[in-house]
Amino acid sequence: MKDVYLFNPEHDLALAHGAHNYTAPPFARQFRHDLRLLPAWVAPADSYIAIPDDCSIDEDSRWLHDRHLDITPIHISKVADVGSCCIHPWGWDATLRYQLLQAGISPDYLPTDEQLDWIRRLSHRRTSIAVHEALGNAFSPCPVELTTAEDVAAFMHSHPGCYLKMPWSGSGKGIYRVIDPTGDNHVPRWIEGALHRQGSLLCEVGLDRVQDFAIECICRDGHAMLMGYSVFDSDFHSQFGSGRVAPMEALHEMLLGMYSDLDPVIGQVLMAIDDLIAPHYNGYLGIDMMLYWDKNGRIALNPCVEVNLRMTMGMVTAAMGSRHGLQGSFTIVASESGHDVELQQNQLK
């Protein structure tokens, strides 16, 4: 059975929409087009990577060959010709399933409606609350889910510097950091719009960040397995900025140097994922975490900032460092036309 990888970064937006007929905005479609080969870093040798039909097979083959990636590009309309295959998108949602069915791919190789319902349900940010609760709320302040503008306003006035997060969002999208609750005239409209579209907001106390990182996992046969670590920097609104590319052992040692009790906590998180997610989901999974300064000036751990039931940028950087022997920094740089795929390699210095 052949492996087929596919980049659909609009996945989080499609989850928020919920139905199978979501149309991504132009910036998301451009992002998907320009970084179409990104999963090739994660894919095992002799896999396929599905690309838009208007892209050149020859050009993408040269790009992959120049980076010593033994991956074959194939137009999405031709994936059905592969026959028996295992499809690995950036993330599964109803829209992608519908698109692949329209491309002639057998439903035997796609998740069922019930499986997609579980993915959407577990991709809700309240899953992070369940993980905190499974760990006994023993580490950092737990997010709270609020459903009215009045309750959200009360929270942000009590916690200046807090984060308001839409339930279905990722990679820093759908997040509002409230620095001045009384002087920010935009935030009330943002709250009303978010509650209207998604029904609730996850509200989090702002923490004095030391380092963002994640554990990168795969769920298979009812069990979550640790694949590696990613260390990254994010901006003011928690959007991905850059990722560190290094061997897994080096990243692990760096994190242990800042927080020596990390490994037992990761074990507890994996047990929570085994209970909460793995019985209902097979695929890639990333758990974002954060080291921060506590009120006593010590480094503390937030063991679950968010859970992503999909592939992540951290999986890309982890594979670059551990499997492909690269070291440096991974950054996606916007060009005038969008996000230039050629800049992936140029940023590894």
Regions found by a protein language model. Name each.
Residues 1-45:
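N-terminal-proximal low-complexity accessory segments that begin disordered
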Residues 28-42, 50-154:
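Conserved N-proximal alpha/beta basic substrate-recognition cap immediately N-terminal to
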Residues 142-143, 161-187, 213-214, 236-254:
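Glycine-rich phosphate-binding loop of ATP-grasp-fold ATP-dependent ligases
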Residues 186-240, 291-304:
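Phosphate-binding site of ATP-dependent enzymes
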Residues 217-270, 308-333:
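ATP-dependent carboxylate/phosphate-activation module, predominantly the ATP-grasp catalytic core
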Residues 226, 239-299, 338-348:
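A long amphipathic alpha-helix within ATP-dependent nucleotide-binding catalytic cores
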Residues 282-344:
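C-terminal structural cap/anchor segments
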